[in-house]
Amino acid sequence: MNATTYHPVSVTGKMSLKSRLSSLRFVLLLLLAQSSLADEMASDNFRLIELFTSHGCSSCPAAERLLGELLAEDKQLLALEFHVDYWDDLVHGSDGNFVDPFSDASYSMRQREYNVASLAGRPGVYTPQAVINGRFATVGSNRRDISRALTSTEPQSLKIRVDAGQTSDTLSVVVTGSAEQRAELAGINISVARYLDSATTSVTGGENRYKSLTNHRIVTSLTILGEVSEDNEMSFTLQKPAENEGCVVLVQEDASTPVYAANACP
């Protein structure tokens, strides 16, 4: 009879392997949970850059190019480009003046209102000027300052959800928050800024004469939808933006206050 040699398996080794696999699963679950929490926390923050600019300003094309680069680098970035009108009548020697086709007196007023408030950074009425979340101002072509401001934004005070509406040409906007948040911001305006996604303009006069300028997120209107209610969530129906258009919904009393919340239309 042939002898059979048995090779005992270490129970300790088995348990050690199971333990290691269990630990690995725990670590993976923990990492997933942390990632989910980070995503949730990130969604509580918003990054909105408002660029005040003009086709009549020779320093502005650099800021407009930077805005395009920032949008290409960060698909979650909210941006609104406001063209002021105070350059329209300025004569630049023999080049004359140029009336910016996107300029509006109300956008110049918005910039002035911002600078009545206590903006951090470099406040004042000038172009190009970038305002981040209605709290921080800097030169619109200063990538370093803008990037720093965009990485230190405040959490949203309310939640704005923008979804497809009941019909194919509408959007549904719902603004929610805790009872405390709604009470704190009761009466604050809820507005929608509509914009052209991009456009190129041939400038025929002023400091940028003979230049072809490409702009992004060019604001065409800023309209109040309603106010924050202390008692209920707020809901609105919007006309869906056309092709090469978009919109941003924001909670802000006026430009003398910060932007408390913002979200883009899908």
Predicted features and spans:
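Bacterial N-terminal signal peptides that target proteins for export
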Residues: 3-26
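Cleavable N-terminal signal peptides of Sec/SRP-targeted secreted and luminal proteins
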Residues: 29-30
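N-terminal signal peptide c-region/cleavage motif recognized by signal peptidases
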Residues: 33-35
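Local sequence-structure signature of Cys/Sec-based thiol-disulfide redox active-site neighborhoods
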Residues: 41-73, 77-84, 89
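Short, glycine/charged-enriched secondary-structure capping and boundary segments
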Residues: 65-66, 94-96, 145-146
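Thiol-based oxidoreductase modules, predominantly thioredoxin-like and allied folds used
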Residues: 76-109
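Short, conserved sequence motifs used for protein processing/export or organelle targeting and
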Residues: 98-127, 135-266
